[in-house]
Amino acid sequence: MRKDHRPYFVKHLYHRMTVAYVNHFIRPQLDSLGWGFTFMKPWYVKIFGAPIRIGRFATLVAASDRRIRLCVWPDQPGRGAIVIGDYCMLCPGVRIGAAQAVVLKDNCMLAGNVYVTDSDWHGIYNRISVGKTAAVTINSNVWIGDSAIVCKGVTIGENTIIGAGAVVVDDIPANCIAAGNPAKVTRRLDPARRMVTRAQFFADPVTLFAGFDAFDRRWLAQNTFRHWVRHLLFPSRSD
């Protein structure tokens, strides 16, 4: 697709449909879901187990070939939880599995195919039990790169970046960049530099969302329903 051919009213209707889908099908599966959420293709977000909590202004982007999966499978009665803070973003293919607890604090971003788990899910010698478990804590404003894996018992400090494909098996301190298998610190961030987070992006949500709507109205103003249907059935290079 070279551009969005939908007329404004179709895109607006689609957005309302996704919000309704989240409220009808996904919200009841969660212990809490904050307001201001954005779910892209929410029918590809799969939830299993409880408790799972998601904070305000969450952004979840799923796809047919890369579903987001949040799974709580307790190793003992009364344990197991996934807690996702405010302003967090999960990209296509993200998987989070919790036998004890996985906590993402505010402003965290997980790129495509990231896997976070607090368990081995099988023992080395006992392949029946869940195996060793240890809670995972990802502190505020952490950015985890594409296809990285965060293993049991890990704590990642605030503002830290985890490189693409990294395998994190030990704690990573705050304000650094870590990469590799196993992940090691490769660079320290300058603590004197001002850090801009997703919280600032959503600081004035009414104005922000009104701006998005105004942009769509302008950008899609020339699109007609007839042209959109023709594009779907008979696409051409001129589209």
What annotation goes with each model-predicted range?
Residues 77, 128-138:
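Glycine-rich NAD(P)-binding loop of Rossmann-like domains
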Residues 120-121, 126-128, 188-189:
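Conserved catalytic-core motifs of eukaryotic protein kinase domains, centered on the activation segment
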Residues 170, 187:
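Short helix N-cap motif at coil->helix boundaries in the Bergerat
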Residues 95-99, 147-161, 166-169:
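Beta-rich strand-turn-strand
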Residues 1-117, 139-140, 174, 183, ...:
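Domain-scale signature associated with acetyltransferase and cell-envelope carbohydrate enzymes
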Residues 135-136, 153-154, 175:
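A short, glycine- and basic residue-enriched loop/turn
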